[in-house]
Amino acid sequence: MRFSKLYIFTFLLVMNKSAFATALCSSEPSDSAVYQCTLHEKQLAEDALNQEYTAAKKRIASSYRADKKLADDYLSTLTNTQRGWLKYRDGQCKLEAFDAEEGSIAHEVATNICIVRINKERLELLRQIPY
């Protein structure tokens, strides 16, 4: 079944209840272009998340260099928390894309937009570490 651009953005608006969902890649001319745009945005968000996670680990190591055990404990806690957060993000995005047929463009677009949004929220938290 082919989903029109209008259907995808209507679906995303209802699912995400966010202006962000309709703004991201909304100027693309076709369903395929919307998908490619959200895929690109997702990759950028994933790269930014990974870079900030690495930077947070470096800040912790630097801030706690006088106490290696404390630094190791903090880093271990961050690693475990990040793993849990990734599970949360993936589950939340699965919920948000649930009504679209799995494997469809609409499902992939909804998932990509969700990942971008939630990654941006996580970036803000990671930038504050160490607290």
What are these regions (language model features)?
Residues M1-I8:
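Bacterial N-terminal signal peptides that target proteins for export
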Residues F20-Y131:
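N-terminal alpha-helical modules
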